[in-house]
UniProtKB/Swiss-Prot annotation:
Listed GO biological process terms: DNA-templated transcription; regulation of DNA-templated transcription
Organism (species): Escherichia coli (strain K12)
Keyword RNA-binding annotated: no
Gene assigned in the entry: gcvR
Reported function: Negative transcriptional regulator of the glycine cleavage system operon (GCV). Does not autoregulate its own expression. It is not yet known how GcvR acts as a repressor. It does not seem to bind DNA. It could interact with GcvA and suppress its activatory activity.
CDD domains: ACT_GcvR_1
Protein name according to UniProt: Glycine cleavage system transcriptional repressor
ATP-binding listed as a keyword: no
Keywords assigned by UniProt, alphabetized: Cytoplasm, Repeat, Repressor, Transcription, Transcription regulation
Gene3D superfamilies xrefs: 3.30.70.260
């Protein structure tokens, strides 16, 4: 199937976790003739969320759009769907990965996302988990962020700002910046 004849749909399914639920959803997607291009699954409390980017012919996408709400009701799932298009990813010459461990309190995740925003970086992935307080230890927040920068300079400048924010918040943090143009030159690719 040519790219122009492909159609795309983003689906989010949210509901109580139980054995076999993800298989039931993916089997329904396949039975409609759709392909799962990309997906993410997360457990949040007793709920799960399953996000998928589907591709297929116009007929396949229309079939999943018309049948998934019924399947969702049958499985007691909240289903959200939105048509989208394929687009080439713009070049991102630098990527940044950070991990942070800090005593939990409100606004911490916002502080780190604001840091990336101030450096014009696109957050591609954000994972956070809170460990409950135990004995004498306060609740701990663990944050992982992956971000991409359209400008190498923004990625280089974020290192010092990240370290300063970790110091201000009394957080333990690590940052890894990869500048792909430098990385390629080291590997002999220009």
């Amino acid at each position: 199937m040519t790219l122009s004849s492909q159609h795309y749909l983003v689906i989010t399914a949210l509901g109580a976790d139980r054995p076999g639920i993800v298989n039931t959803i993916t089997r329904h997607v396949s039975s409609c003739g759709c392909n799962i291009e990309d997906s993410r699954l997360a457990m949040l409390g007793e709920e799960f969320t399953f996000i998928m980017l589907l591709s297929g012919s116009w007929n396949a996408i229309t079939l999943i759009e018309s049948t998934l709400p019924l399947k969702g009701a049958e499985l007691d799932l909240l289903i959200v769907m939105k048509r989208t298009t394929a687009r080439p990813r713009p070049p991102m010459p630098a990527s940044v990965w950070v991990q942070v461990d800090v005593a939990d309190s409100p606004h911490l995740i916002e502080r780190f996302t604001a840091l990336f925003d101030a450096h014009h970086m696109n957050i591609a992935e954000l994972v956070s988990r809170t460990q409950p307080a135990e004995n004498e230890r306060a609740a701990q927040l663990h944050i992982q962020i992956t971000a991409h920068s359209p400008a190498s300079a923004d990625a280089a400048n974020i290192e010092q700002a990240f370290k300063a924010l970790c110091t201000e918040l009394n957080a333990q943090g690590s940052i890894n910046v990869v500048n792909y143009s430098q990385h390629d030159e080291q590997d002999g690719v220009k």
